[in-house]
């Protein structure tokens, strides 16, 4: 029943998104994007209340912790998506179409990765320690790397698409496919969709291990992941400006990853409750936001 409720909510949100709010290829303003994202955030929080009444307080804390971590870790994803759109010169009015169908792929691929990960961890518990090393290494690296980049032209996937598929030289409106001389062609819009799906899989390799350190409950992991990604895609059109304002969040994220990695290593000796993980996550994110605001105010005064 819980899965039916979740998928009903997601289906309703997708219908509302494509069938009502974005029925026409109109450019979303900063304010509209912000309000739409706030709407998604509210739905995500309300779903946490549903989890509280059906699964208990600990599961609720795990849900919110996973949600916040996935939200924070997906920020770099937005920059790479921007690079892809710029490379293919995708107009803003068509970008939402790509993001929407990208969500459909995310819903499917994340399910496979999460369930596959849970099966592997249940069978080989030592994998968690490998995840811990990856998380700590990623956290340390985050202090030294500004944003993840993506060399599209030299990527294996892009070269393979160009080599094996018929590709139109220019966009064909909002179409992913066109037929010419009885041959099927893919458009740059479709290639951008494939690359965005591939990038999401790459980023999931970073974020999902962090979630496994919080809980191995498939329902908590999957629902928090999907709600976080839905809200982030809604915020895409104003996120670049927001991330620029909150530039220190990446350091908060680095500390969160290191904390989670350490938590895995010590869990046999010290059991860290779900409420502490949630408190640490919220505190570090808020510190990153406050530090960013203070820094921006200082810069603006100079």
From Swiss-Prot:
InterPro entries: Integral_membrane_TerC (IPR005496), Integral_membrane_TerC_rswitch (IPR022369). The chain crosses the membrane at residues 1-21, 33-53, 67-87, 101-121, 124-144, 185-205, 220-240, 253-273, 274-294. It is a multi-pass membrane protein. It is found in: Cell membrane. Keywords: Cell membrane, Membrane, Transmembrane, Transmembrane helix. The keyword tRNA-binding does not apply. GO terms for cellular component: plasma membrane. It comes from the Bacteria. Belongs to the TerC family. This is Uncharacterized membrane protein RBE_0082. The lineage of its organism: Bacteria, Pseudomonadati, Pseudomonadota, Alphaproteobacteria, Rickettsiales.
